[in-house]
């Protein structure tokens, strides 16, 4: 290839300023001529460096399925980008090497580089055979045994062909050469030795990190090694070190994945294993941001979120002290319960709870006239930022780990905004847009007596002018308006007794309050 390029040089006219060596699978960016003409023409620059996009993570395709080159340049996702070096003056350089050919200065010239704004984009034909590369590289090494660059490329090509022993020996030869002084390429020789030498993998990766500590690739490979053997502290350290390096630079050795999802994924997994759950959550989100369609990364988010997710429980109470004690004892057995806020209607109810002394249980009284929605909002104001909020009546029986199951469902599916345990005999989950209203036969909607609101929606407040019912419907409407689902899940169950407090309200008075609430609710809904 070097001889062929030199033959082309000899065929060119003498009265030209620049030679752009452009392969058939490369495209010049718009405005290339103006960028090149802006380079000083005073003899101070004989090699113009430019931005070279070598590959693409995402292409834009035409309707017939072919690659839309201009569309990809405008809207595609570049992969490896580095500074190209194949634009030279007419007589300053010649080519050498049979393959992976390079420009070298001719006698009487010195290397004088300068930057320009020109861009070249590579659209590789991945179906093209590489079969000629290895014989040509072996020939280059034979003819130029002191050329460290050729030895490196030959060792790499041997690795691609699975000729492990020869490849490792060639990489070690590269490291021993007096001319092998460029740290990044030396480190990559160590990296590829590690890749092909499982028993010595850690040793060579550590040497590579020491040789080239400012490059991400070696640190990420070291983190991957520690992940593979379950050394979570090592994985955490190496991935953190990789992510601390924020200057990608413009070397041809950089790999897009090292600046994408992979180091964040490794750090998230290691942090999760070490119990550093907030860090796991942060970097899990970052990994997913780089690869939003990766199912494994998406699935991992459940574990990171669930490790830190907790629920605060809000229970209004007045007379049903026995029921309250029962449900509080059930809640205290559930590891996902963070705080239990008991909102007492009056001093008598508050005083009767002196025997509940667990630190998770906070007993409070509201001031002024008591109603259920005022109590719910009081609990909202007390709840911990970032926690889901579980609204619970004091006349409900919960199955074992009910809160944990509800929290898990919210963490697993971000589309759920409001969830309640199954309270009928049905076994399947149901998405609903209304409330229970005393229907326990499988046709009822969201249970106002046991419903959990997702943590990111807890800025909501119930309308306190509604005294008893229809506030639940207001909440359901709010969740649906936010584009979220209201789910009755069969993964958790509860049994609801008829409210002791409501049963003490005379039927006529109850009907009057409910009808008044309905009028106010309808009026508010029309206003929305």
Predicted regions mapped to residue ranges:
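A short, conserved acidic/glycine-rich loop-to-beta-strand motif
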Residues: 42-50, 413-423
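Acidic donor-binding/catalytic loop of UDP-sugar-dependent glycosyltransferases
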Residues: 24-38, 396-409
